[in-house]
Swiss-Prot record:
It catalyses: CMP + ATP = CDP + ADP; dCMP + ATP = dCDP + ADP. It comes from Methylobacterium sp. (strain 4-46). This is Cytidylate kinase. Belongs to the cytidylate kinase family. Type 1 subfamily. The gene is cmk. It is an enzyme of class 2 (transferase). GO terms for molecular function: ATP binding; CMP kinase activity; dCMP kinase activity. Its EC number is 2.7.4.25. GO terms for biological process: pyrimidine nucleotide metabolic process.
């Protein structure tokens, strides 16, 4: 059983994906970390984030251990990853990586921007998690504050809006709702309510897994 979860930044898809993976005993991949890791490799090498050849090389040599680097969670890496993820060669280089993960015996949970549309188009469970830009900005603002990264709410909202536009408008694998995905708007939902809504979808497609 592959559970494909897509959605914009700070929609709650990562929290939900981790909870579903834990509940159903499946491995989980936050595919956004792959793009953050590529961006970090470029920054460490003092290369331009728009250098497609260098970014592709970094993507093709990416090691799973690099996904544990604490720097990947920093706010600046989100913007850097958004730039790198717009490069077609990088998306192509990481596609096999993601598909191999999804092919794990028993299934997997993957979350990102193009899981249900490109990476796992045949996934039996596809969820698209969204929320209003303002609510997503509030969540990210609280998260950053909790990590000791104080930043103005207006700056966080502007970053969310900018990343939404870039994700939706890029030529390679733009963010969109898969035709057979179930949309869950978490604007007014807490994490538990979002989990219950998602689990109901999973169990309708995967009977007996409560």
């Amino acid at each position: 059983m592959v559970i494909a979860i897509d959605g914009p930044a700070a929609s709650g898809k990562g929290t939900l994906a981790r909870r579903l993976a834990q509940h159903y005993g499946l491995p989980h991949l936050d595919t956004g970390l792959l793009y953050r890791a590529v961006a970090l490799a470029l920054l460490d090498a003092e290369r331009d984030l728009r250098d497609e050849a260098a970014a592709e090389a970094a993507a093709r040599t990416l090691r799973a251990e690099s996904l544990g680097d604490a720097r990947l969670r920093e706010r600046a890496m989100g913007e850097a990853a958004s730039l790198v993820s717009a490069l077609p060669a990088v998306r192509a280089a990481l596609l096999d990586w993601q598909r191999r993960f999804a092919a794990a015996p028993g299934g997997a949970v993957l979350d990102g921007r193009d899981i249900g549309t490109v990476v796992c188009p045949d996934a039996p469970v596809k969820l698209f998690i969204t929320a209003s830009p303002e609510e997503r900005a509030h969540r990210r603002h609280r998260e950053l504050g909790g990590r000791g990264e104080p930043v103005a709410f207006e700056a966080v909202l502007a970053d969310i809006v900018r990343r939404d536009a870039r994700d939706a408008d890029r030529a390679a694998a733009p963010l969109r709702v898969a035709d057979d995905a179930v949309v869950i708007d978490t604007t007014a939902l807490d994490a538990e309510a979002a989990f219950r809504a998602a689990a109901a979808v999973v169990e309708a497609r995967w009977p007996g897994r409560g």
